Amino acid sequence: MIQLNNGNKKILQIAIPSIVSNITVPLLGLIDVTIVGHLGSAAYIGAIAVGGMLFNIIYWIFGFLRMGTSGMTSQAYGRHDLNEVTRLLLRSVGVGLFIAFTLLALQYPIERIAFTFIQTTEEVEHLAGLYFRICIWGAPAVLGLYSFAGWYIGMQNSRFPMYIAITQNIVNIAVSLLLVYGLGMKIEGVAIGTLTAQYAGLVMAYLLWLRYYSTLRKRIEWHSFFDKQAMYRFFQVNRDIFFRTICLVAVTVFFTSAGAAQGEVVLAVNTLLMQLFTLFSYIMDGFAYAGEALAGRYIGANNQKALHKTVRQLFGWGLGLSLSFTLLYSIGGQSFLGLLTDETTVIHASESYFYWVLAIPLAGFSAFLFDGIFIGATATHLMLKAMIVASVSFFLIYYGFRGTMGNHALWMAFITYLLLRGVMQGVMGRNILGYKTSKKD
């Protein structure tokens, strides 16, 4: 039996539930696609794909609510500052609700602008519009859940976000099946099922807080909610994460767009190969969350020894997992692609690009882990700098080599982008490891 020391146990106690939560995220969309896939028209599947893409982009951009809340909460937890821990949750939820109601107020221009750029059939656009106009009302629940998830992780508790994610999937399946097949509501039923699951998750997050953190209610101080210095710090951290996310979205969307411009076979190949990156990212993000929680905790406690030990252990896990994924993909990667498609043209075309996939784990694992450590340290400005340099390099490499290398230039640019993020943050990370809580990033 493998014996784990206390540090590794703490890492896994946060990482494993986070990995489970990550894996359940795409299940919400997969469930919707599976249900509408039996309604007799491909337009329903297209509508879910388009609507899901819109919400992925919108909510991805506002993911700073989870990350910023996690880093600052973990530091306050490390300082045993329960008043600040409470204020951070209120601040984050308040900002999230403000953004959500702004999205609701602007839903019609957002929809019109989005469909100006999305070229699809009239039927798909009509159905996607129905899906969007129902699901957009879930914005308060989704952004509220971001705040709760970040707060729970900052409190060293990733189990609650996992419980919430599992509950959401169960509710989504039950309500969607009832409305679609029981009441014949078709895509509206799927949208309402998703909406119901989102609010069920928010209610559960609040009830868990009341049940297990009720002692914090007496620490609510509304007069300190708008403390200027604290609000400035909150928005400073989240501003950096917001722009970092914009860079990440730009690279991700461009990767798909550049592949599509090279034809449907190349687009299909890139889409399939990126599934292997996505699978790896779900695992590494779990350890990044552990980095957020533990790095922030030890920085808040001024415990550099524990911080250094945690970073070493995180990178031990990261290196081991990246080597394992490289070996796994080299042995069974092509077989995995065969499970995703039976198009021999696509599978054959993917063979010439597969070595780029083998480079992803070793090139990318440090970027994931340093992201978590930097978020825990609230060193978001440095993280943004690394992302800007890596993103600019991505575009320079692609446009510099696409004429001679074609799609290989796109993959080379992506691998370099991952590698540069890790290398730059590794260099800057030396300063972070020497941080005191009073030191600015």
Where are these regions (language model features)?
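Short alpha-helical transmembrane segments in multi-pass integral membrane proteins
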Residues: 1-15, 73-140, 182-242, 295-360, ...
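Transmembrane helical elements of multi-pass membrane transporters/channels
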Residues: 13-32, 134, 145, 167-168, ...
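Helix-terminus/linker motif at the lipid-water interface of multi-pass membrane proteins
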Residues: 27-46, 115-122, 178-185, 246-279, ...
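Alpha-helical transmembrane segments of multipass membrane proteins
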Residues: 30-34, 147-151, 173-178, 206, ...
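Membrane-helix boundary and inter-helical linker elements of multi-pass secondary transporters
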Residues: 38-41, 75, 154, 183, ...
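Small-residue-rich hydrophobic transmembrane alpha-helices
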Residues: 45-105, 142-160, 269-331, 365-378, ...
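Short runs within selected transmembrane alpha-helices of multi-pass transporters and secretion channels
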Residues: 134-153, 161-169, 190-205, 285-288, ...
